[in-house]
């Protein structure tokens, strides 16, 4: 089939020659039945959802329980990001660095071009223009995803500013990131489709130097919604390195004091460390309030006033469902309850509602994520551990009015945090920016699921970016240091290291966490205002229990002391682990971080 015979190619709603040429090239390669430019309208969304219901991909949920919401159950082989099939293809291997899978770009293009050949036969090729961050930003970052998945089109409408407005912003010659996606499941004439088409062969490939993403074989989440981690972190981190800004795996929170002063905080935590819960915090201390700017990604650059400003480039939440409930995260539950949600791989109740592990209620019968009958005796989880809700951010009851500000919000503090049973205190303040970079660069978190390796072993996850770096980790650390060097030191955010997960000898959590974490954040903002004390320790400045506002908190004071304790012998045991990590980073490790390591060693004696 030539381009002349592919319906929809000749009626494109754009004069952008670069875009048109690319769409034609992809259509000739992948051989779809038709080409459709997504416009992002309500009518299109409803039409595609109805099509997905008809195809068996979506089940419409009970509108009284979940208004205008749907459930999708994926193929059991296609349930999560696949780090082993994720590649960074730079011209030189060293530019991808030791934390990434690398292949020569020409070789990868050859392999994937063969896979794409005819891969959309029997399907529709959708052209999905989108903008990361506000459309009226000074330097809007645009992308176009080509996909053969309706699930992707409807999800991209929730997760990004997608459709006609983004296409108009592109104009006739604007730059955009090319994001090509195919599930790799062509249909022969008369062949019956399956509810969740995908391919056993999977590649999620990034070409940072040409700002391109090629994904094949997966219809799921971050592998297929290419604005998510692929663009907003892997490609954007490379763009940020070249252009002098930061693209980070961070929530953005607005904390408001009783005096009505607002502080914006960015925080990087690895998965399963409570990022979304903190982003939607409900403070437990009198007079303090919190609002949400973002729960996953922060793009940060310096404003004209010399302060660091952050933007959430996303338009929705793509949250992990299990563990989310009315006590751990009431604001997430209210956001979901407003409707317009696509759930993936959660369980379904007999009355057409959804359920997952950790949710209130004690169902006696469900249809599980594999589509099978489930009872409490089944002996396996009803919802997949990585099951998701995809919901518009505009429905969040605590959404900060500044969330859509094209200038972003000025950041007062950056938090790094992981899940550590021992060693790391509840909160530590870095001595200065470079020391803060050292803290982020050595961030470790205990594995939480047996599948990821031995439970309890500490995996280094620098700035919580290990799976998301678009270039060499050593160059990334150097970039962070340079960002600080090129700034007015007095205007840089303070950096803190937090650990909500420290345990006592008997294995219980020493700190209650969740809304009580507002007490820890209060100390951080009081440090910014020079109103709170802390004691200097070998690892940084740590509060005593007396420095924290513990009024009305029902916790044993000895537990708080233990949560804040700095034990030199535990830190001395940490040193060889940090050294091993730095050796892995290799020759590109900045001298500044070696200096910080030597200074820590010396302070520990």
UniProtKB/Swiss-Prot annotation:
| Cofactor(s) recorded in Swiss-Prot or TrEMBL | Mn(2+)
Where do the catalytic residues lie? 273
**From what superkingdom does this record's organism come?**
Bacteria
Q: How is the cofactor bound?
A: Binds 1 Mn(2+) ion per subunit. Can also use Co(2+) ion.
Query: What biological-process GO terms show up in the record?
Result: cellular response to glucose stimulus; gluconeogenesis; glycerol biosynthetic process from pyruvate; oxaloacetate metabolic process; propionate catabolic process; response to lipid; response to starvation
Coiled-coil ranges from the UniProt annotation: none
Q: Which reaction does it catalyse?
A: oxaloacetate + GTP = phosphoenolpyruvate + GDP + CO2
**Record note on temperature dependence:** Optimum temperature is 70 degrees Celsius.
Q: What happens when the gene is disrupted?
A: Cells lacking this gene are inhibited when they grow on acetate and palmitate.
Q: What is its main location?
A: cytoplasm
Keyword annotations of the record: Cytoplasm, Decarboxylase, Gluconeogenesis, GTP-binding, Lyase, Manganese, Metal-binding, Nucleotide-binding
Q: What family does the entry list? A: Belongs to the phosphoenolpyruvate carboxykinase [GTP] family.
What name appears for this protein in its UniProt entry?
A: Phosphoenolpyruvate carboxykinase [GTP]
Naturally occurring in which organism (per UniProt): Mycolicibacterium smegmatis
